[in-house]
């Protein structure tokens, strides 16, 4: 299995941004044309892109849908997979993205509030198109754009959603997200070892060594944002590093 390095294209107000720990107004990067950003990652070797509508995640309104449509259309011609999250609150939201040609829809708050949604989408479109996002803070699940904490642990929820038909999990460690201070591999490893579906890691990657560390957890890939946008390493170097071992 090839460990995938997946560049993040986070959108807020029509721009490509990177926030610190998901806090609005904490932009460390703001670029005017997200479509061009996405195509640039593809030119540099990305096989999958991670698109997030932050307006959707934080306010529940998918304001960046037209931009996502443009990116999907441009990338489909190049055989690049697209996973999309942020503000997918209903079956209709997810279905419209999958019918557009998105490879995987990422359900966060919606899956936790309405687990049947995972089942419905999985049985309609196939589980390979359904990813559940598990965001953890202090070892507990966090929802609503990281503003609310739940009692459950990632392992408990990961097992539950695997049973319900999720084809993969996206695990974000909020404790390290956007800080670029390195990763803590333990929570990711625990989750990987508790389920039999792929786990994509996210949060805190700041060096090529972090990528090697996450690869060793057994994760199927990693979403990288701030480190790529601030030049900690290039995408080419990241892909080369993770394919060496």
From Swiss-Prot:
<dbReference type="GO" id="GO:0005737">
    <property type="term" value="C:cytoplasm"/>
</dbReference>
<protein>
    <recommendedName>
        <fullName>1-(5-phosphoribosyl)-5-[(5-phosphoribosylamino)methylideneamino] imidazole-4-carboxamide isomerase</fullName>
        <ecNumber>5.3.1.16</ecNumber>
    </recommendedName>
</protein>
<dbReference type="Pfam" id="PF00977">
    <property type="entry name" value="His_biosynth"/>
</dbReference>
<dbReference type="GO" id="GO:0000105">
    <property type="term" value="P:L-histidine biosynthetic process"/>
</dbReference>
<keyword id="KW-0368">Histidine biosynthesis</keyword>
<dbReference type="InterPro" id="IPR023016">
    <property type="entry name" value="Isoase_HisA-like_bact"/>
</dbReference>
<comment type="pathway">
    <text>Amino-acid biosynthesis; L-histidine biosynthesis; L-histidine from 5-phospho-alpha-D-ribose 1-diphosphate: step 4/9.</text>
</comment>
<feature type="active site" description="Proton donor">
    <location>
        <position position="135"/>
    </location>
</feature>
<dbReference type="InterPro" id="IPR011060">
    <property type="entry name" value="RibuloseP-bd_barrel"/>
</dbReference>
<keyword id="KW-0413">Isomerase</keyword>
<keyword id="KW-0028">Amino-acid biosynthesis</keyword>
<feature type="active site" description="Proton acceptor">
    <location>
        <position position="10"/>
    </location>
</feature>
<dbReference type="GO" id="GO:0000162">
    <property type="term" value="P:L-tryptophan biosynthetic process"/>
</dbReference>
<dbReference type="InterPro" id="IPR006062">
    <property type="entry name" value="His_biosynth"/>
</dbReference>
<keyword id="KW-0963">Cytoplasm</keyword>
<dbReference type="InterPro" id="IPR013785">
    <property type="entry name" value="Aldolase_TIM"/>
</dbReference>
<dbReference type="InterPro" id="IPR006063">
    <property type="entry name" value="HisA_bact_arch"/>
</dbReference>
<dbReference type="GO" id="GO:0003949">
    <property type="term" value="F:1-(5-phosphoribosyl)-5-[(5-phosphoribosylamino)methylideneamino]imidazole-4-carboxamide isomerase activity"/>
</dbReference>
<comment type="similarity">
    <text>Belongs to the HisA/HisF family.</text>
</comment>
<dbReference type="InterPro" id="IPR044524">
    <property type="entry name" value="Isoase_HisA-like"/>
</dbReference>
């Amino acid at each position: 299995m090839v460990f995938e390095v997946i560049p993040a294209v986070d959108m807020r107000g029509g721009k490509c941004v990177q926030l610190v720990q998901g806090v609005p107004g904490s932009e460390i990067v703001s670029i005017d044309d997200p479509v061009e950003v996405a195509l640039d990652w593809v030119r540099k070797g990305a096989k999958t892109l991670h698109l997030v509508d932050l307006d959707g995640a934080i306010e529940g309104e998918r304001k960046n849908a037209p931009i996502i449509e443009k990116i999907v259309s441009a990338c489909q011609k190049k055989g690049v997979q697209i996973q999309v999250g942020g503000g997918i609150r209903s079956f209709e939201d997810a279905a419209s993205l999958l019918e557009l040609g998105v490879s995987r829809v990422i359900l966060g708050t919606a899956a936790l509030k309405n687990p049947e949604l995972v089942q419905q989408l999985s049985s309609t479109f196939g589980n390979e198109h359904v990813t559940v996002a598990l965001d953890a803070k202090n070892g507990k699940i966090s929802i609503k754009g990281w503003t609310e904490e739940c009692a459950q642990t990632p392992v408990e929820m990961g097992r539950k959603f695997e049973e319900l038909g999720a084809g993969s999990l996206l695990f974000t460690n909020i404790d390290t997200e956007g800080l670029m201070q390195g990763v803590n591999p333990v929570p990711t490893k625990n989750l990987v070892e508790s389920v039999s579906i792929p786990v994509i890691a996210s949060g805190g990657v700041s060096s090529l060594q972090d990528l090697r560390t996450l690869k060793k957890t057994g994760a199927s890939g990693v979403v990288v944002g701030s480190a790529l946008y601030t030049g900690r390493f290039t995408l080419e170097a990241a892909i080369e590093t993770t394919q060496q071992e």
